[in-house]
Every structure is written in structure tokens, then in C-alpha cells.
């Protein structure tokens, strides 16, 4: 009887460790995304994740429409739900179309006179998979300014992250990265997508 119980416990233990191999994040730690700060944050953010227009307005912009999307993770690689994601960027003309939060900035980088509906800022909330997305446009690029967007992520259990997203070809991805509302995207539209998985310092309550 004792031998039978011993064999049963051995098999049960082996099954536990064999199953755990399918969940590598139990032991992994994700590399925390480094902070890169930007002085051109808007004084007031638009409350939608569509930067191409204000809510209830028609779109009229000059440039290529894109998706910016990805996942927010904690340092244990666990997806972070209900994180607030703030995005801001310049338009195709290289200027920010809003009033800046800070006063000591280069005023030439901003414009309030434009017939474009592009707002330059937006807010999203991550879903239960840690996913977020924004509809935006490719910003201006030159030898001095690279194509990029700025992002800040806030969650009550984690350290706030602010960084820059490099909108270069190496960060392009297919349209299966994240969940996007099909109402906002035409099925036949081949919209360029840029994906960024961002890791915040700290851990959430749940574990994988």
C-alpha cells in the first residue's frame, strides 16, 4: 500500500512539472521599458483613441492613416488590465495641433491654425488581455525629427511609464496584433500597423 501511494505521488509530481512547461512566464521576468520623456504633452487630452478627429466630427486629415497597438505587461510578463494609456504626437506637418501643458517649449512646434481634424492626442484603456490601440497617422519626419509618438501609461499598482514609440519599419506588424473594433476599420483597408509591448515596473495581484 505504501509503495502504491509513493508511486502515485511521484506520478502526480511529474505531471505538475510537465504541465508547468507550457507556462514559461511563471519564472520569466520581462525587461522593463525605459522612460523617455517628452516636453510637448498636451494641456488637455482628447478622450478617444481615434486621433484623426474629435468625437462626433468628420475626419479631414493629410497623411497616411495607421494603427498603433500592443500590450501592457508588468515585470512578471502578466498582462495589465484597466491601465490608462495616453498618446500624443505631431501631425504630418511636423507640428502638434493643440495647446501644450508646459509653457517653456519651442512654440514653433505647435499650431492652432489648421483645417485638419487631426487632434494629436488620445486616451485608451487596456482590456483584460492588456491590449490597447490607437488610430492615428504617420507623423512628419526629417533629418532632425524621426517618426515617433509619445506614450504614458498609468496604473494604480504599477510605476507610471512614459516613453517614445519609434514608428519605423522594424516595428511594423500584421493586423492580428491586438483586438481592434471592426466598426472602425474597413475590412478591405490595408492600414499599416505598429506594435509595441510595454513593460511597467511592479507586479499586479494576479499571476500566470
Swiss-Prot record:
Gene Ontology terms for molecular function: ferric iron binding; oxidoreductase activity, acting on single donors with incorporation of molecular oxygen, incorporation of two atoms of oxygen
Record keywords, A-Z: Dioxygenase, Oxidoreductase
EC number: 1.13.11.-
Record has Oxidoreductase as a keyword: yes
Similarity section: Belongs to the intradiol ring-cleavage dioxygenase family.
Protein name listed in UniProt: Putative dioxygenase RC0543
Organism from which the protein derives: Rickettsia conorii (strain ATCC VR-613 / Malish 7)
Amino acid at each position: 500500500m505504501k509503495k502504491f501511494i509513493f508511486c502515485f505521488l511521484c506520478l502526480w509530481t511529474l505531471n505538475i512539472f510537465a504541465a508547468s512547461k507550457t507556462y514559461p512566464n511563471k519564472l520569466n521576468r520581462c525587461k522593463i521599458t525605459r522612460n523617455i520623456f517628452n516636453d510637448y504633452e498636451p494641456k488637455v487630452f482628447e478622450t478617444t483613441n481615434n486621433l484623426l478627429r474629435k468625437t462626433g466630427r468628420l475626419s479631414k486629415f493629410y497623411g497616411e492613416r495607421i494603427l498603433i497597438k500592443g500590450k501592457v505587461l508588468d515585470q512578471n510578463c502578466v498582462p495589465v488590465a484597466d491601465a490608462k494609456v495616453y498618446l500624443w504626437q505631431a501631425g504630418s506637418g511636423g507640428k502638434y495641433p493643440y495647446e501644450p501643458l508646459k509653457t517653456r517649449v519651442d512654440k514653433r512646434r505647435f499650431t492652432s491654425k489648421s483645417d485638419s481634424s487631426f487632434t494629436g492626442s488620445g486616451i485608451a484603456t487596456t482590456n483584460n488581455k492588456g491590449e490597447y490601440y490607437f488610430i492615428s497617422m504617420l507623423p512628419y519626419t526629417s533629418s532632425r525629427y524621426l517618426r515617433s509618438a509619445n506614450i504614458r501609461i498609468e496604473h494604480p499598482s504599477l510605476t507610471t511609464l512614459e516613453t517614445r514609440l519609434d514608428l519605423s519599419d522594424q516595428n511594423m506588424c500584421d493586423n492580428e496584433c491586438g483586438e481592434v473594433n471592426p466598426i472602425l476599420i474597413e475590412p478591405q483597408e490595408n492600414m499599416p500597423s505598429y506594435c509595441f509591448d510595454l513593460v511597467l515596473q511592479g507586479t499586479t495581484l494576479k499571476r500566470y
